[in-house]
Amino acid sequence: MSLRFVIGRAGSGKSTLCLHEVQEELKQRPRGETILYLVPEQMTFQTQQALIGSEDVRGSIRAQVFSFSRLAWKVLQEVGGASRLHIDEAGVHMLLRKIVESRKDGLSVFQKAAEQNGFFEHLGSMIAEFKRYNVTPSNVYEMWQQLDAHSSSAEQKLLANKVYDLQLLYDDFERALIGKYLDSEDYLQLLVEKLPQSEYVKGAEIYIDGFHSFSPQELEIVRQLMICGARVTITLTIDEKTLAQPVNELDLFYETTLTYEKIKQVAREEKIEIEKTIPLMEQPRFHSPALAHLEKHYEARPNEKFHGEASVTIRTAANLRAEVEGVAREIRRLVADEDYRYRDIAVLLRNGESYYDVMRTLFTDYNIPHFIDEKRPMSHHPLVECIRSALEIISGNWRYDAVFRCVKTELLYPLDVRKETMREEMDEFENYCLAYGVQGKRWTSEDPWMYRRYRSLDDTNGMITDSEREMEEKINRLRDVVRTPVIRMQKRLKRAGTVMQMCEAVYLFLEELDVPKKLEALRIRAEESGDFLFATDHEQVWEEVMSLLDTFVEMLGEEKMSLSMFTDVMSTGLEALQFANIPPSLDQVLIANIDRSRLSNVKATFVIGVNEGVIPAAPMDEGMLSDEERDVLSAAGIELAPTTRQTLLEEQFVMYQMVTRATEKLYISCPLADEEGKTLLASSFIKKIKRMFPDVKDTFITNDVNDLSRSEQILYVATPEVTLSYVMQQLQTWKRYGFEGNLDFWWDVYNFYVTSDEWKQKSSRVLSSLFYRNRAQKLSTAVSRDLYGDKIKGSVSRMELFNRCAYAHFAQHGLSLRERDIFKLDAPDIGELFHAALKRIADRLLRENRTWADLSIKECEHLSTVVIEEIAPLLQRQILLSSNRHFYLKQKLQQIIFRTSIILREHAKSSGFVPVDLEVPFGMGGTGSLPPMEFSLPNGVKMEVVGRIDRVDKAEDENGTFLRIIDYKSSSKALDLTEVYYGLALQMLTYLDVVTSNAHTWMKKGHAASPAGVLYFHIHNPIVEVKGDASEAEIEKEILKKFKMKGLVLGDADVVRLMDNKLSTGSSDIISAGLKKDGSFSARSSIASEQEFNVLQKYVHHTFENIGKDITEGVIDIAPYKKGNKAACTFCNFKSVCQFDESLEDNQFRTLKDMKDSEAMEKIREEVGGE
């Protein structure tokens, strides 16, 4: 029994010496004693390759490469102890979830924390850490007693409570495992116990290579290996000079020096012979003087400078994507120009979550074979999502999001269905569920679902059309596709008495859905498309899910569990599932994490993402215990994993390892912005490298090739997939600026795409964008007639929409596009309710031959309640009756109608105007409808403007009959003559024109009427600020002012007094007008003469004719208006259709100048030739 150390700096040949010794031994004595070669898990594959890579050693039974966990498995198979069931990480998390749920009421700190994402991952890691550091539940309990007895501050009490919770959960976890199960850490503890019994290890020659430190548990394994083996050789990265000096925590080799001392101490305790240490002083790894210099002087202070041509490259990239593309281009260049193999190259990084997806995509596009040494979670695979969402459906009362997450996995689809068709049908089905607010009991009820197109609150026709019946049948068929398998599982889960039966219910759910066959079809499809990674994913996920169910049954099969706990435990297990890495092929670029990688024999290393806070890592508290808490436990005798401070001290060694992996070339790069465009800073580590290599120039990597030289641009010509975007970029620049520059070879590349049989069609769509203009072509007369017909019948809102943006009009009224209906109460629904409520009250008053002025406050309240109760079942598929929240909203809406009724009562008392009718139709046909506003357009097309007027009021005096329009609005609005001029606000003046033009036939007395004005009435329940001692009457007066109607009224004092008979001088509280003492109008009055009203009405006719002409002649310009801070695009539903983009030359707003009313009126006169 002996111990031997092989030490040396990085690249000194420690591993090479050991491998050569083993290979020589195998050549000399192929059947001798066992040779064990122990390495970290991530080194096993490459070490195995290196061991049998010699021409004289093509295979071996005598020498085997192991990690500690693989050695444990080997020994336990030999001597026994492997009969207990192994539970993986997913099983550990599931067991911990069950333990926490059963212990929840007794936990002090973790009761609420258990609901946070990642809690069980942290808890599992904490327990694994306890085991690695030989900390038992009794140790933790004793620590709690000690802390509890001396806790005085809040921080100390928190730590004591946290340790108490950990002790409870750790103890329960160990009790659940004992005699039945083994987790990954238990294997190592069993290895310690079983090694003395192993004949396989006894007398073996043992090499331990690639480690820098050992946990206490691993140190015990090393102890037993020294006792059982013939000789143990351990390699450590240490400079021999370091061993001759006192241990200093700031030393580069501090961690490995401590490891060296700990192992020597173990050897002394076991009286193991310590052979003479073998120090390696040369640097055989490095073929580059610059890299040798970097390794030799890495920790020197001040930095030793290297002058001359260096094989170190420093690169700064515009963004993360540019950085990765720069790496990909350089890899291709090394392979093409310098005879590198892909396996000679490695990419090292730390923040993989930011890089891996980008690297997979770009390396595939660049045709670079690669292997990412990182396990991927299975959580996004359709099978995992299907199980998780199906259980959420059942436990969460069939919520919309859970149902359609399950649907979108496509595993509920029948096996033989055409997926494209089913997807379209399910999209329609989802639209139905959103529109009707389907959830909860409606899914499980046997009552068929109804489908009716919503028309209006006044539509009481109960007849169903053929198309509605057809849609209803489809919806109920699709409902059964979705709900039938889930309901079957729901019934089985409710009948289940044990966890085993619940797991069986999940299994039967998957079997009845033919999931194995569906996954096999997905695997075949992935293989046919060349995506072998995803093909293996579909195989792995079924095996892992079945293993998870088996583990669940093995651990908790006979226990009873509530459905909610079963769902939580199962979800926790599913979240922990990971895809196993496929072993790398013989020729791939290795992409690995800096902290976990153990590279050897790579010629070139790319270290990417070298940003501040990443390399070196910023201090960060993670896990269950903070640094301060770990220090307290350490002081009390419980050794755990290093604190953040200790980790930061070790960071220099990590970076040293990082830059000493390559033999020939080192590339260091960082992006200046992340994927979202946020600024990133270069690491101080890059500054250090620059000080060591002052002649190395920092190269900037960009995806914009315009500023690059011709030789640099040529490097951007890689695979057809990635080069296409650069061709586009260059030719777009040429098109926009006419710059020739280096375009000669880019035209050659362009010619490749347009002449290649393979790429001609693939590239045509992309290249056609060179000539793309986001300009809508005018419709032909034939197409216009097909879309709109020979007679246009449209509302005023439609005409205004055309003037806001002709393309939006085309999308809505030509193509009939609309957003999908969602079961929610929007502003238009509330507006419709307000109109209907006020009309019902007004109709009741007319039937009773009463006016608003006749109502009492109590009657206002009663009537508002009655009409809201009548309307609620009719509005938006009974949305106001669908939930407590909507019921509360219904009450608030009733209060608004109540308040509005009171104001209308006050207005009526103060006004000589009385309502003639409400919701007055024109051009709608039927009894009581006024005729439309008709136009014969120059191209022969007839156009009718139709609509419905909220309210028409009438007043009479010795000067005749006056009519005014009142429009109810749920938001504050005024009439802007600038908007009238631009055709954006035509509604009120159109209504006034319709009623005054038809007054002689419409009014009972049969004589003409004059325009009195147009006014907006804001329906709301305002809050007013008053002094503390204000009376109720004063409060009501302030509220009344909030309802002042804005608009435009006839500039006639008598007519204005008819609107507010309390007005003598000053401003009216009812309308936006006021009188001076001399009888003239105040400056802030919104008034117009009768002649001006006539001019405005002519202008409205003129505008409609122009709109009609443009519509029928096919104008669909993408030309939205912009006026001040208002723009047509702000609330437009069709932005994704027109793709309006101000950066394009063709896409610019029609900027409308804001004007004073007087200026707008003057321009209107000019247009119609008014006086």
Swiss-Prot record:
Pfam families: ADDB_N, PDDEXK_1, UvrD_C. Residues 281-587 form the UvrD-like helicase C-terminal domain. Binds 1 [4Fe-4S] cluster. The keyword Iron-sulfur applies. Residues 1-390 form the UvrD-like helicase ATP-binding domain. Its EC number is 3.1.-.-. Its cofactor is Mg(2+); [4Fe-4S] cluster. Disulfide bonds: none annotated. One of its GO terms (biological process) is double-strand break repair via homologous recombination. Keywords: 4Fe-4S, ATP-binding, DNA damage, DNA repair, DNA-binding, Exonuclease, Helicase, Hydrolase, Iron, Iron-sulfur, Metal-binding, Nuclease, Nucleotide-binding. ATP binds at G8, R9, A10, G11, S12, G13, K14, S15. [4Fe-4S] cluster binds at C805, C1129, C1132, C1138. GO terms for molecular function: 4 iron, 4 sulfur cluster binding; 5'-3' exonuclease activity; ATP binding; double-stranded DNA binding; helicase activity; metal ion binding. The keyword DNA-binding applies. Despite having conserved helicase domains, this subunit does not have helicase activity. HAMAP family: AddB_type1. PANTHER family: RECBCD ENZYME SUBUNIT RECC. Belongs to the helicase family. AddB/RexB type 1 subfamily. Heterodimer of AddA and AddB. The heterodimer acts as both an ATP-dependent DNA helicase and an ATP-dependent, dual-direction single-stranded exonuclease. Recognizes the chi site generating a DNA molecule suitable for the initiation of homologous recombination. The AddB subunit has 5' -> 3' nuclease activity but not helicase activity. This is ATP-dependent helicase/deoxyribonuclease subunit B. It comes from Bacillus cereus (strain ZK / E33L). The gene is addB.
